[in-house]
């Protein structure tokens, strides 16, 4: 009996017809051999997930081929490169056992059970063997094995970790597992997708080695994790490796120490200490945000840090978030440090009565928050246990929702523009599996966000399943100078807390109505933002944020009186200025000021003191001589007052 024709639909709605159910690779080959050679995977029926080229397609399947030119194709390359790395290591050291090797951001890793410790000294040997495997252009093919065959095979190879994984799949009802072969002898348990042959790997590099535990549990076997990366061409790899080296120089922990801004102590894990200089940066950000809050109708509130746990039972945090909270018992009552401000703002809202005319109510709060992070997960300022957010909650009517979203996005744009952070993307994160609230509420909340963005002509991407447990959200993903994404701002629609706390307002009809609640932040955690921003700017913060904005450098003690006059005048204009009167050479003082990233250096010698002029040197190395005191004062104070990203002289020099 002949099979009826199978129609495959391409992205432009053209079709390919087959007399059998084709694979995705066959679809690529039907278009052209060159395309087939460059194809690494396929997206089916509008899914964002990449499927293997060996996937057999049903009639009317919509297929979008993923080629080497597609940005996401590198995920398939890295997945296959992880197998090649594991194969190379087992070729060199057969006694090493394999566990798992997933793709991660910017690369991949593989965890190994090894009788000896891997070091970076082993990398050259491993990379050489990987290159041999790539040069052989071994075909990669998939076989689906019955569960029992897979268990027996891996048991015979003494691969106990693979056996455990397969047995877990059997408990979940799986009857077969995918096995991928590199050539004919080496194979691994895997779902895919994978490239067609090892020769499609064009550029890779082993990066580092670290300890790990099987399945992330310290009670399990200790493993060794080898990190690596791969790209579709060598140029992309070289750029990435350059950025890695640059990231080491820009590491905020290194910069924070060099600039004397913050430090950590083991007696307060995950809790940064901000020095006077660091606190200046911190407070500068808060002051700027407070000014914007006043301008845009927010009221800043102060709420307690510790609450009876019943508050978090009401809010749902106890049921959904308690593993990330700190608890204590006082006078036989259970208390918890607040991990978020939203429940306390609901209490504050309920302390008053509102009519429809009073809404929106906008509460901003710089209160300290505490969230538990595992010791191994903490990282400088970007993963801490105590922090402050530029947190605010908006209580509004449903008919005000789109307007409030627009106002928030306008405010966010102003802040990001002021900070030189124009490169960002918006993601709409939808309902997760672990959530509270009815499906009707989720439909309403997700729809409101999407429609508001569309009405503002703001492009966005869907991030399915990544919403908060209480509602969908917009995640603002900032891309820094090294092309790394950071989730900073957020806007979350919450229909659940107003219901949980029975929040009400009196409508125009004199009946009680439920307000809509928006959770919003622009920078997110200030601690985390400062870490990210230090790395983005390489420590060259805008002049208005810098702890020391001006350094006065004397050439000789004879001009000290004039220097002190300048210092006092600048202080009178609220400029943070230091006078370096040390008996050191001028070049040494300049170098010291540059290392501290000080935006303005005023240099005074005999000639300047006599003519009451100065030489102004900027941290970019440019120098402007013969400026009058008034000119320098106006320049510096204007730059700081307007919160300029850099000196106006630096801008004009760049423009010209």
Swiss-Prot record:
Reactions this protein catalyses: tRNA(Thr) + L-threonine + ATP = L-threonyl-tRNA(Thr) + AMP + diphosphate + H(+)
Major enzyme class: ligase
Subunit structure of this chain's protein: Homodimer.
Residue span(s) of domain TGS: 2-67
Task performed by this protein: Catalyzes the attachment of threonine to tRNA(Thr) in a two-step reaction: L-threonine is first activated by ATP to form Thr-AMP and then transferred to the acceptor end of tRNA(Thr). Also edits incorrectly charged L-seryl-tRNA(Thr).
Localisation per UniProt entry: Cytoplasm
GO molecular function, one term: metal ion binding
Keyword Iron: no
The enzyme's E.C. designation: 6.1.1.3
Source organism, top-level taxon: Bacteria
UniProt keyword Oxidoreductase, yes or no: no
Record key words, sorted: Aminoacyl-tRNA synthetase, ATP-binding, Cytoplasm, Ligase, Metal-binding, Nucleotide-binding, Protein biosynthesis, RNA-binding, tRNA-binding, Zinc
NCBIfam families, per the entry: thrS
UniProt-listed GO biological process terms: threonyl-tRNA aminoacylation
Name of protein: Threonine--tRNA ligase
Database matches in SUPFAM superfamilies: Class II aaRS ABD-related (SSF52954), Class II aaRS and biotin synthetases (SSF55681), TGS-like (SSF81271), ThrRS/AlaRS common domain (SSF55186)
Record-listed Zn(2+) binding positions: 342, 393, 519
Region (Catalytic): 251-542
Named cofactor requirement(s): Zn(2+)
Cofactor binding remark: Binds 1 zinc ion per subunit.
One annotated Gene Ontology cellular component of this protein: cytoplasm
InterPro entries in UniProt: aa-tRNA-synt_IIb, aa-tRNA-synth_II, aa-tRNA-synth_II/BPL/LPL, Anticodon-bd, Anticodon-bd_dom_sf, Beta-grasp_dom_sf, TGS, TGS-like
């Amino acid at each position: 009996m002949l099979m009826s024709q199978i129609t495959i639909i391409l992205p432009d709605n053209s079709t390919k017809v087959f007399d059998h159910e084709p694979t995705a690779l066959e679809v690529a080959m039907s278009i052209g051999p060159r395309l087939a050679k460059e194809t690494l995977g396929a997206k089916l029926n509008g899914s964002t997930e990449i499927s293997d080229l060996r996937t057999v397609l049903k009639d009317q399947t919509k297929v979008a081929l993923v080629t080497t030119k597609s940005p996401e194709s590198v995920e398939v390359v890295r997945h296959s490169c992880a197998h090649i790395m594991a194969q190379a290591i087992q070729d060199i050291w057969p006694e090493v056992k394999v566990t798992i090797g997933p793709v991660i951001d910017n690369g991949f890793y593989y965890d190994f059970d090894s009788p000896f410790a891997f070091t970076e000294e082993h990398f050259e040997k491993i990379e050489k063997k990987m290159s041999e495997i790539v040069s052989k252009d071994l075909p990669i093919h998939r076989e689906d094995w019955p569960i029992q065959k897979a268990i027996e095979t891996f048991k015979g190879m003494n691969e106990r970790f693979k056996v455990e994984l397969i047995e877990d799949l059997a408990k979940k009802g799986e009857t077969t597992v995918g096995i991928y072969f590199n050539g004919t002898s080496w194979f691994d348990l895997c779902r895919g997708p994978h490239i067609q042959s090892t020769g499609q790997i064009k550029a890779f590099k082993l990066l580092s080695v670290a300890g790990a535990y099987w399945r992330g549990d310290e009670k399990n076997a200790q493993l060794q994790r080898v990190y690596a990366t791969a790209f579709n061409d060598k140029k992309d790899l070289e750029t990435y490796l350059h950025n890695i080296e640059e990231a080491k120089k820009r590491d905020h922990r290194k910069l924070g120490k060099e600039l004397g801004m913050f430090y950590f102590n083991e007696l307060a894990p995950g809790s940064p200490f901000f020095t006077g200089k660091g606190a200046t940066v911190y407070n500068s950000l808060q002051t700027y945000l407070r000014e914007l809050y006043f301008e845009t109708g927010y009221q800043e509130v102060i709420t307690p840090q510790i609450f009876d746990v019943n508050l978090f039972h009401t809010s749902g945090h106890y049921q959904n978030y308690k593993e990330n909270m700190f608890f204590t018992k006082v006078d036989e009552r259970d208390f918890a440090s607040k991990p978020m401000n939203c429940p306390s703002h609901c209490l504050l809202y309920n302390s008053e009565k509102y009519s429809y005319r009073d809404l929106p109510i906008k509460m901003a709060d710089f209160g300290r928050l505490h969230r538990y992070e595992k010791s191994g997960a903490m990282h400088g300022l970007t993963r801490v246990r105590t922090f402050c957010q530029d947190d605010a909650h908006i209580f509004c009517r449903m008919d005000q929702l789109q307007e409030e979203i627009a106002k928030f996005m306008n405010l966010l744009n102003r802040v990001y523009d002021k900070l030189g952070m124009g490169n960002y993307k918006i993601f709409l994160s939808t309902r997760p599996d672990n959530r509270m609230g009815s499906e009707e509420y989720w439909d309403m909340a997700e729809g409101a966000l999407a429609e508001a963005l569309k009405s503002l002509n703001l492009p966005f991407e869907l991030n399915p399943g990544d919403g908060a447990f209480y509602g969908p959200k917009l995640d603002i993903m900032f891309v820094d100078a090294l092309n790394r994404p950071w989730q900073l701002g957020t806007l979350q629609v919450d229909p659940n807390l107003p219901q949980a706390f029975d929040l009400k307002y009196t409508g125009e009809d004199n009946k009680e109505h439920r307000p809509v609640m928006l959770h919003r932040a622009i920078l997110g955690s200030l601690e985390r933002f400062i870490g990210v921003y230090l790395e983005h700017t390489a420590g060259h913060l805008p002049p208005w944020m810098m702890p020391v904005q001006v350094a006065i450098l004397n050439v000789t003690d004879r001009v000290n009186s004039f220097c002190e006059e300048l210092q006092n005048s600048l202080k009178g204009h609220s400029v943070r200025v230091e006078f370096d009167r040390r008996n050191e050479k001028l070049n040494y003082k300049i170098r010291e000021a540059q290392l501290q990233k000080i935006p303005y250096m005023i240099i005074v010698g005999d000639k300047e003191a006599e003519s009451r002029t100065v030489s102004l040197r900027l941290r970019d190395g440019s120098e402007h001589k013969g400026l009058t005191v008034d000119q320098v004062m106006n320049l510096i104070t204007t730059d700081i007052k307007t919160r300029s990203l850099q000196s106006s002289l630096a801008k004009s020099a760049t423009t010209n």
